[in-house]
Amino acid sequence: MIAYDLSEPAVVSRLEQLGPRLKILIDDSGDHGHADSGETQATQRLRISAGPANVKRQHMGQLQHNKTIVVEGPKVKMAVCGSTNYTWRGFFVQANNAVVLRGKNAIKPFVVGFDQYWSTETPAKFANTASAAWTSLGLDGINAMVAFSPHSEANPVLKFIADDIGTKTTSSLFYSLAFLYQTPGVMLDAIKKVSDDNKVFVYGISDRKVGGLDLQKPDGNVSPVFPSALGKKLPEPFKSEPVGGSGNRMHHKFLVVDFNKPTARVYLGSYNFSDTADTKNGENLLLIRNRRIAVSYMIEALRLVDHYHFRVSQQEAKSTRTRLQLAIPPRLPGKAAWWSKYYTNPLKIRDRE
């Protein structure tokens, strides 16, 4: 197991029950390394239950940011990865995702990757291992690969993804990426580039570093959604939702490209699509070329983005002193209907489709 955040008591208690069958890497960067942190307390407990030799702390070049569990037994062979940290916030507050992979072939890259992390302390050494390259998960009927960070600057995965988005997106791009607008670089440039193409429908959301969210509308404009607007006029229990801090609402890290095409694909994992995630942190990143799976992530992106798009519309209506209400059909002959732009404007056509 590899844990970035590890402070949920129910998780730690279950790990204790495994005894010496557990082998775990726990991040010790920043606050995680403090004597009173949840991660340090978990380390102390697990060293007693699993044995000191089975519990290790590390942070690679900056963070050991993986969130992976591998079960390798006579009956169960399973790996869990994604964006979900082992905390109360990760499970019950944030928008997160996790992927469960089953089978001997599927878990093998995770077993090898764990061993490489365990024996390697520096980004430069890990970047030269096979785990830093794309590796097939060997799933029947599904083209899926995984790569672990850190990568070398000579072989960055981030540029591979940016090139894919910037030059090969033909229909649509949906994204839900924590901190996108706080991590400028080739990924943000690629998203901006494809957003300028009126033949491509782009819809996305990103958590803001200082509270709230950034929402990208299909017209390419990015609108901030602030915490005050998110909580205003909400009923309980939503009104008392925890606020403050970064990544508090939206913690996903995924991109969906051309979900409605045979070439549909989705990138997902713990990987934040930044230079730091690419060349410094310990991360997992999956590339799945499967339309059904891509559609499932597109629906999650649409669920989030459409909800907050309505909040943006509320803010815009207030600032322009216009009434936000349902439109009615035209009453006079020759007057354009409210829906006519969805058949004439290229972006609106994509939206309708």
Show where each model-derived region lies.
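Active-site beta-strand/loop signature of hydrolases that rely on acidic residues for catalysis
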Residues: 2-3, 26-27, 173-177
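Domain-level detector for secreted/extracellular nuclease and nuclease-toxin modules, and
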Residues: 4, 177-179, 346-350
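Short linear motifs in intrinsically disordered/low-complexity regions
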Residues: 6, 29, 37, 141-144, ...
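Aromatic-Pro/Gly-enriched surface loop or interdomain linker
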Residues: 93-97, 101-161
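N-terminal carbohydrate-binding/catalytic regions of secreted carbohydrate-active enzymes
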Residues: 1-11
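Beta-propeller domains
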Residues: 132-204, 210-211
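PLD/PLD-like phosphodiesterase catalytic module centered on the HKD motif
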Residues: 12-92, 100-107, 118-119, 171-172, ...
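Glycine-rich anion-binding loop/nest that anchors nucleotide
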Residues: 3, 177-178, 254, 270
